[in-house]
């Protein structure tokens, strides 16, 4: 088992990475917990619900299951209220603990529910998709979507632990694996050129879910994110670079309708768009744009964005958490392994859109 420590002003906690972590979840529950509520969806519950509940039952606490509808389309206030309804109907108090068993949607919604229920209760992240394991479960970002923008209603709220069972990835559809790998290669692009090169060299092993390659990719991704979050928990500076590809990607998700593309697919395509914009606005080498496009294609993600029309693209990107004073800010790369967040000239954005949409 690998352990990565996350240390932030909002809380320090371990990330446990390895096979069989689902069977050890009882160890992650605080001793003074009065009850445990497992928040999940029908798909994950059918695969792992009974196993997780058996592990949690060893704590001697009452264990409640809350099942939410599956998918990004249900990441909203209406679905969030299903969590609150169950917690209140079952009289869970401030010492109850939530367990987020699922992908990014479940993790984000459970974390947000924990942040606001009775003004804050504890929760544990148990991510079951690759994307959630390497990205959304780490760092304390929690949110629901609004019809006008993705993740616009939320809070920074850290879990007490993240439990990553690498064996659960064997049940993931290939498309979900590709979506998760987009976030993996992102860390190399923004923070670690050596890791980017390793991803290029090992893309076949990663797509095949080769255990050693996968374990290293997950650990290194968590290490890099933990370093950034430890320096900038609330995204007031450095943490913004973790949003590489997300300004374009969120526009794709909003423009097509949540759930049409997976989040990781939109981010992967958005990284190609960000690379093109970086050649115009940050001096990114043109040859490296092709490297980005090639690796995004090799992990199985789209490299051509939908043609939403330039004006609609710009309007969608205005509804972004990084927009300041009406000015859209992008994560740009001077070179592989280095990134910065700043505004880009609209003419450059339009050119990048022309090069990357169809």
From Swiss-Prot:
What reaction does this enzyme carry out catalytically? 7-phospho-2-dehydro-3-deoxy-D-arabino-heptonate = 3-dehydroquinate + phosphate
Coiled-coil regions listed: none
Record-linked InterPro entries: Dehydroquinate_synthase, DHQ_synth_AroB, DHQ_synth_fam, DHQS/DOIS_N, DHQS_C
Q: Name one GO biological process term.
A: chorismate biosynthetic process
Major subcellular site:
cytoplasm
Q: Does the keyword Lyase apply?
A: yes
Q: Which Pfam families match?
A: DHQ_synthase, DHQS_C
* Single GO molecular function: nucleotide binding
Q: EC number(s) in its UniProt entry?
A: 4.2.3.4
Q: How is the cofactor bound?
A: Binds 1 divalent metal cation per subunit. Can use either Co(2+) or Zn(2+).
Query: Where is it found, in Gene Ontology cellular component terms?
Result: cytoplasm
Q: Quote the subcellular location field of this record.
A: Cytoplasm
- Identify which cofactors the protein needs according to its UniProt entry: NAD(+); Co(2+); Zn(2+)
Annotated keywords: Amino-acid biosynthesis, Aromatic amino acid biosynthesis, Cobalt, Cytoplasm, Lyase, Metal-binding, NAD, Nucleotide-binding, Zinc
Entry binding sites for Zn(2+): 183, 246, 263
The entry sums up its family as follows: Belongs to the sugar phosphate cyclases superfamily. Dehydroquinate synthase family.
Q: NCBIfam families, alphabetically?
A: aroB (TIGR01357)
Q: What does this protein do?
A: Catalyzes the conversion of 3-deoxy-D-arabino-heptulosonate 7-phosphate (DAHP) to dehydroquinate (DHQ).
Per its record, how is this protein called by name?
3-dehydroquinate synthase
Gene that encodes the chain: aroB
